[in-house]
């Protein structure tokens, strides 16, 4: 029997980390530990981005590190930002969305991209170095067929020098740069090719290509730059009449993208591999035929979802970032409190006036760190601007956690369990009982046991409730509106709802799914991407709607889910979402809609092959007779 979610408010244990909670304390502890381990001076990391003095003020909590600066600095020391959740201002999210729109149009709709770039520049008179670098890279791409090689060379150099102040042409390996900066350097290589300065282009390209390996970037970091390196490398080696090497680096890049389930620049890379493969007389090879199938599947998917085939990608992801105004408003609404009530402290004094809170909730202002933390604590949560997924100082532990999440996404349960056992040995004894660490361990162990059919659905649900209660009051589940929910909490809540569905409690399941989606819907519509918990919840909710024979609504949910997934670079769920669409269409009218569901099913198969998702490949194989014959 499942745990009573209407029980007493769960006491969430406050760790020492939480008691000492200051702005960014967890992040800076991790950042400093990693920097010292690698023997990197702070000045080397922050150079060209922010001053040493400004960084010290941020460390002391006197000011807040912007999301862009934080991401940029993390990338410079080779750490992906997926290991953290961030609470950011509405302006930062709007700026990201503006840049994303420019990125979408720059390759296929140049005039529209030019207008958007001009608008972005006009609205950002005082640009940061990072923003200026972005704009110059876009300007280079928009003018590459209009300007001379010399003009493009100057433009690309200027882009690099926005953030790189040291000698980067001769001694790149000694510097700490991120994928964003390597991209700008690749434009310098492209410019040198346009100037016919082949050897200079090769010398710089060779340094860029070797940089990720020299600095021991993990695959998740290399994924952000591998395709760009390959595409420029193909141009370079083709000019040097070494197309076999061009083909090889393209293959290596594609393999890394497939291992990471990433679509970052994959379509232009497939186009180039097919073109060069034909030049090498490989057109009849099984490998090239598979590339053609991938290319066709991507083309169908992009066409149906009105997404450009060719686009630019921003480095990193924004899927773990939350709008501070939406966070505070959701928490207040969940507690059914007025703005006046939350602006008063325990002694009855007003620490914030209603007008200020109203502007914060509307996204017009960002609260001070003190007010943000006071408000969130008052409403039952311990939040910070930057929060690691687990209470640890170890990047290795956070990386292993991400490996577990990926393995679970691929339904590789034995692998996930093995990594979890290794992770336990890496966690310090004093950290082992931390709420998020316990939550992660309990949830993964319960999910693994359920998958192996070693526990019943009811027992698994009880364990999910127990895992959730490590950080989240179970009483909140019975409220009219859910409060702000962190990534892992959302995934656990969705799985709880899905187990209600499996034991036939459809009303309970639907109620949770609907309220959970409401948490993410507003920001999903604004950013046009999914949150990890959102893609899980919508996928499982679609299954419930299918059980209820609400096929049209299920298809609508799956279409929204797929579109938002395609707007980010991770493709892990795409094969499953395409199959969901095929199932919706088949069940609604399998005679009338035959062409539609077959097209979806065939695409799903190609994406399962692309992701090397053996479980999904097998799942679809046994259903071929139903959908294809």
Each language-model region and where it sits:
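Structural signature of alpha-solenoid helical repeat junctions
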Residues: 92-93, 131, 173-180, 218-228, ...
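Helix-turn-helix repeat elements of alpha-solenoid scaffolds
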Residues: 104-119, 145-169, 193-212, 240-252, ...
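Tandem amphipathic alpha-helical repeat scaffolds
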Residues: 97-106, 134-148, 180-198, 225-239, ...
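Short alpha-helical DNA-recognition segment
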Residues: 38-57, 336-359
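Flexible helix-coil transition and linker loops at the boundaries of alpha-helical arrays
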Residues: 83-87, 120-132, 161-178, 210-223, ...
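A short, Lys/Arg-rich alpha-helix, primarily the initiator
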Residues: 2-37, 307-336
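Alpha-helical adaptor scaffolds
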Residues: 185-246, 495-516, 521-575
